[in-house]
């Protein structure tokens, strides 16, 4: 989401133009550990890694994307694919998507291959509402999307158990950033916004809304922003500004 006052690296984009959700499958797909290496240390060495897509896993994430669209009042779900090149798993992914979307006739859908989809993220980010993607594609898009708003430092994420049978986990898209630990330059917004996502997931809608509103107020003033957003605040100062705006 592009906030008011935050410098956008994309030309002629303003707050309201970029506000998308990336729904990523996070238990199987391209990041399975099925495979191995053969003929090591020879000139015929081979490395193989399999993509695993199950109807259970694919249906779960795609259904969640549509249910999220209903819950959040979003109007469109975009399918990220590459079935013109990945000839087995991606056609399967598309088949499941085309089946599931029929259960949600009130929600618009479209589909793009991942290469042109990334180009469209940069050229026309306002086109997108909710994008559902495999593990690898979702990993890429969930970094590219925030970068289009100026920094990945503000982007939140959640590893969701849709059935609420088990705990869900919330963290910034950028992870723990150990390379800058203790330097006071990390943007705390991603962590704070992840907390708001958690509250929203737990049903604390007003508390979540209060935090997001405070984030918007904080980022609208340049001095409150960290260096990645051309501001002058350190981590603690930026976090304190968010807290002060809540109070």
Mark where each language-model region is:
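N-terminal glycine-rich phosphate/adenylate-binding segment common to multiple enzyme folds
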Residues: 1-40, 45-48, 136
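Short acidic loop-to-helix transition motifs that present clustered carboxylates
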Residues: 5, 112-119
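Flexible, glycine/charged-enriched surface loops at secondary-structure junctions
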Residues: 72-81, 104-112, 204-212, 221-232
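Glycine-rich phosphate/diphosphate-binding loop of Rossmann-like nucleotide-binding domains
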Residues: 42-115, 127
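Short, amphipathic C-terminal "tail helix"
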Residues: 225-247
